[in-house]
């Protein structure tokens, strides 16, 4: 956002969108702080992308999928680098072909071990995947499952205190792939549904989205990410 601002973009922060309507070939975006006219709109609102989509008559199949993080006390160096188990990917994609030998609660809450040290000598423990609407409250049962899985890989963690937990929401799609696409509503684009990969994929998403809006051919095949794959029953 700061880079875009340097190029002349105007940021309008903490300004809720209340509605979108057509005015000729342009959109009029109704916000809490007035109206904004735009030729094109990119819906990059993550778990709230469906809310914006409904304003132009689109049903965007994105759900909120909650994930929790545990934060340890300051302690000795348990590990120097980030570690995650293969189960992180199988839980994300809900693989039927691979089942881990894990406890019922680890399986129930989509828990997979992720460890990340910090510069302050705390460490972060993840991860979980549950459907809880837009609830971002931490669950003690999920925390227990995450601690159980962490101790399975690093037994020393059993002797280290957890000082807090927090949760966030990932934008989930039925086929676990993002939507990076134009739509039947001319000038309305979607860039959402990346689930836990949004930060890492943001540069390439921005590049191909800019190409689409400019009428240029993206350098890669985006057909697997098209919005209409859901309408066609392909997902």
Language-model regions, residue ranges each:
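Helical element adjacent to the flavin cofactor pocket in flavoenzyme catalytic cores
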Residues: 1-39
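Helix-loop-beta segment of a Rossmann-like dinucleotide-binding subdomain
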Residues: 1-7, 28, 128-132, 185-187, ...
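Active-site catalytic microenvironments for nucleophilic, acid-base chemistry
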Residues: 3-7, 51, 55, 212-216
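C-terminal lid/capping helical subdomain adjacent to the catalytic/cofactor pocket in oxidative enzymes
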Residues: 9, 177-235
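Beta-strand segments within the central parallel beta-sheet cores of soluble alpha/beta enzyme folds
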Residues: 14-17, 161-163, 222-227
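Active-site substrate-recognition segment that forms the wall
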Residues: 19, 35-36, 46-165, 169-184
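A generic structural signal for beta-strand entry/edge sites
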Residues: 24-28, 120-122, 188
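N-terminal Rossmann-like NAD(P) cofactor-binding module of classical short-chain dehydrogenase/reductase
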Residues: 42
């Amino acid at each position: 956002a700061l880079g875009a601002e340097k190029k002349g973009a105007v940021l309008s922060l903490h300004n809720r969108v209340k509605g979108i309507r057509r005015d000729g070939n342009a959109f009029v975006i109704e916000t809490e702080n007035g109206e904004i006219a735009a030729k094109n709109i990119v819906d990059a609102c993550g778990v709230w992308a469906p809310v914006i989509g409904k304003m132009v008559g689109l049903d965007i199949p994105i759900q909120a999928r909650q994930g929790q993080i545990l934060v340890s006390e300051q302690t000795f160096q348990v590990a120097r680098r980030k570690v995650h188990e293969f189960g992180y990917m199988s839980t994300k994609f809900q693989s039927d072909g691979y089942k881990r030998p894990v406890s019922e609660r680890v399986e129930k809450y989509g828990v997979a071990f992720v460890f990340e040290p910090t510069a302050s000598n705390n460490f972060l423990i993840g991860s979980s995947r549950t459907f809880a609407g837009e609830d971002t409250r931490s669950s003690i049962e999920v925390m227990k499952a995450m601690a159980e899985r962490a101790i399975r890989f690093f037994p020393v963690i059993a002797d280290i205190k957890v000082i807090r937990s927090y949760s966030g929401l990932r934008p989930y799609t039925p086929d676990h792939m993002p939507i990076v696409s134009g739509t039947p509503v001319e000038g309305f684009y979607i860039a959402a549904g990346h689930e836990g990969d949004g930060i890492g994929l943001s540069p390439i998403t921005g590049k191909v989205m800019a190409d689409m809006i400019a009428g240029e051919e993206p350098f890669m095949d985006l057909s697997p990410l098209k919005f209409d794959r859901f309408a066609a029953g392909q997902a």
